[in-house]
Amino acid sequence: MTKDELKRRTRRFALDVIRLVDSLPRSKTTEVIGRQLLRSATSVGANYRAACRARSSADFVSKMGIVEEEADESMYWMELLVDSGCTPAERVEALLREADELLA
């Protein structure tokens, strides 16, 4: 996969998560988890773009580590949404798969 393809995928991932969070029923739980999910999911693409501009191999590795952490954190928040009954598993299935692929 090329850099540009991965940039597109991470951007699409962020946009899909934004749509998911906007569609959640309003409650204190979804507000808190939704905010955390938005932060981590949008950070995946932002940090990948930063990694592409890294000035050294060490900088690239460091930023890619952040990308991995944020993708994994996004999975955690989506799993919590399902486990807490805030959204059905089917609603996040594709997003979880994409986050897992981005981690690979």
Predicted regions and their residues:
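Amphipathic alpha-helical assembly/interaction segments
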Residues: 1-104
